[in-house]
Each structure stands twice: as C-alpha cells, then as structure tokens.
Amino acid sequence: MHCYKLTIAYDGTNYSGWQIQPNASSIQQKIQEALCILLKKEKVVLVGSGRTDAGVHAKGQVAHFHFQDYIDLSRLHVSLNGLLPRDIRIKAVEPVSPRFHSQYSAIRKEYHYYLHLNKVMDPFQRLYSWHFQRKIDVNILKKAAILFTGTHDFTSFANEAHRGTAAKNPVRTLYRLDIKPNEGGLRLEFEGDGFLYKMVRNIVGTLMDVASHKRAIEEINQIFAAKNRRQASLAAPPEGLFLIQVFYENENGCLD
C-alpha cells in the first residue's frame, strides 16, 4: 500500500470547514470526491493534519491517502486541480513513507491571523481579516502576546470539540506569537507544537480585548490559572485565520 501526501490551499468562505459533515459542503469532501473519480474508486479516505472551521482559510494544509498502486503524480496533480472548485488548489502531490500520518507525524504548525484596523473596511479584505473597530495600543498587544509563549495549559483558550469532550492533553507549547504590520492593520503569527480546538481564535479575541483596554493585561495569567473557557474572551471571527504551514521531521514528511 502506497501513501501520498497533498499540500492544499483553499478559501474557506463557502465551506462548512475542512471536515466532512452531513448536509454541508466541506473541503475534505470535495477532494475525496475528485480522488474517487480520478482513481476510479468508490471510496478514498483523505486524512487532514487537522480540521479548520467554516470560513477559515489555508495556504498549507496537509493531507494523506493510501492507494494500492503507483500513481502518475504529475497527471494526478493537474487532473485534481482541473476537477476541483477554483477556491481549492492542490499545491503539491508527493509520495511518502507508508508510516506517514498528516496529523500524528506533524511536529509543529504555523497560523496567521489578520486584523484590519482602518476606519473603513477594505471590501477586498472583508473575507480574509477581522475588521476591528476599537482603538488599540499595539505596545500593550505585544506585551500581552509574550504571556502566551512557552508551555502552558491552554484549557481556558480551547472550546470543546464537536464530540463533546475537550482535548485529553491541553498542554501546548507556543514557540512564537509575533505581531507584524500588514496592509491596513496587523498580522499575528502563531507557531506551536499543536493547537487545541479554536485556540488561536480564542487567544486573538482575548488579546484584542486587552489591547483595546476592555480587559487588563494582568487578567491573562488569571485566565490561564482558571482553566475555564468562560474566563477568556469571545473567539475572534473565523475569516481572519489562515493555516500557513504544517511542519514534519523529515523532508518526505515522515518521522523516523
């Protein structure tokens, strides 16, 4: 059995998210359907590195599938993009070790969150950034961001998953949370060893409340200590969030 790795970019605006859901259109579903047609199979199981919610975008989602035969990958690459909607693109198709798993072999991920801070929203950014209309103190924002880096129990910043249970291990390491200037606003860059459900959006929501003086910066450590989602702020909207890249140990994407 051979394993193949896809690197995928998509505009999540018109989808219910990555994961297949009943009576809804998902990115995973669209790609699986295209693979079934091209590989002439009734079922192909595509496994993503993690799910993204409705309205969330990706520049570097990773997924894998298994197939019993060798595949002409150049032809498959072109054919997939020919079948898929224009808001989903396959950036690369690669053979990897049969032991590769897009989720469990990942060692870290990078997300970006885009903020639009101008008084008037740029209509061309409305689906790809959060139009934040309160005045903010960027220096406070940067100081608050530092408090999230390192290894923490992120229970207070994680929603329960759809299955009704929180992650078994809420401890994650955030290697960096950088605040960068971006056209019309700011870009928040997150890189960590893994992220809980809605963790990035919940952190952004809390950071923006602190930066706009709605909450005090001293509350952040209290929120961590509470281990209670209700203590953090509301989640930032999905449209500003992008999955940028998933990192693996080896070039072929497989851990030794």
UniProtKB/Swiss-Prot annotation:
Full protein name: tRNA pseudouridine synthase A 1
Residues annotated as binding substrate: Y111
GO terms classed as biological process: tRNA pseudouridine synthesis
Pfam family, one: PseudoU_synth_1
NCBIfam families (UniProt xref): hisT_truA
Record's function text: Formation of pseudouridine at positions 38, 39 and 40 in the anticodon stem and loop of transfer RNAs.
Keyword tRNA processing: yes
Entry keyword Glycoprotein: no
SUPFAM superfamilies according to UniProt: Pseudouridine synthase (SSF55120)
Enzyme active site: D53 (nucleophile)
Residues spanning the membrane: none
GO molecular function, one term: tRNA pseudouridine(38-40) synthase activity
Keywords: Isomerase, tRNA processing
Ranges in coiled-coil conformation: none
Catalysed reactions listed for this entry: uridine(38/39/40) in tRNA = pseudouridine(38/39/40) in tRNA
Family designation: Belongs to the tRNA pseudouridine synthase TruA family.
Assembly and binders: Homodimer.
EC number(s) on file: 5.4.99.12
